[in-house]
Amino acid sequence: MIYLDYSANTPVDEAVLQRFCEVERNCPGNANSRHAAGTAAKAAIDAATQSIARSLNVQPAEIIYTSGASEANNFAIKSIARLERHHGRHIISTPLEHSSVSGSLTALQEQGYEIDLVDIRQDGTVDLAHLKELLRPDTILVAVTAVDSELGVVQPVAEIAEMLKACPHCHFHVDATQAVGKLPVSFAGIDTISLTAHKFYGLNGIGVLVKRRGLTLEPLIHGGESTTIYRSGTPTVALACSLALALEKAVSELPARVEHIRALNARLRTGLAQYPKVRINSPDTAVPQILNLSVQNVKGTVFQRELDARGVCVSVKSACSSDGLPSRAVFAVSHDRRNALSSWRISLSHLTTEQEITDFMQAFDACYNALTQ
């Protein structure tokens, strides 16, 4: 099998898995309990929180553990909207967002909130001039993905944060799910940031919402004591510790990982350019881990099935929104419905080998010739 769907899920790093097992075996106590086992568990999760904060260059008090980025996105967006409704009900986002963001906004729209989507430029980035036009005194939230999951476009997060300084009641939420582990990230000027471990070789079921100190959110879960007032319940110490290690490795090993991936991406672009019916949708400025393309007049789902039959795993749209509709992200950039329907995504890793790229190109060639005759 040739796995080229790392933006959907990454295999857990062996050291991360070992850390999880070690903590799970050695810390059986509840971190909320007032005895030796509970104290040991609390010390372990406190150390993990400190490590995560260092890796992200934020404060430990700003870390809220979640089950993943989808929960973090829902939590941040809905909580900010409810708590700021006395200032306004206007929210701005983009057509490039993950379904956990767009779905949260749809739910709020049904409750009377007004949602505007900012225009996307030809290179896939947010049109900052249009964003400035959309901002109003009653705008309470701007929600933007740092890196689009389908095209790999890097959004001008710092510029947006600077623009929003003039809007005292407008909060800024950034979905950093596809950014962490792919490029250096800065969270300056951002109110809430979501991320999840399974995108950077951690385990499924654990994520983080970074909440700027001083920002009030409505608790997601009410109940007993926990590591935070925002999400009550017994913390999963081993998952937190495993996320901390995965994040530490993702940050420290980033330069070497990216250098290898960039070379693979360049090789793919060169090889795919030889096929006249191939259109590369990811701009040259996209993160090298993501390469989106279309084969003219061949639905992405059809090409994906053909590759799957040959042992190659790729994605059509986000793994969380494979509903048979054209890619909103690709359509936003190309304004071509057929091209959006034909699009699919290759996502690379530092684990991807040169031989896998060779084998992929052979499988692609066979599928291309079979489907474009």
Language model feature labels by segment:
Residues M1-Q373:
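Pyridoxal 5′-phosphate
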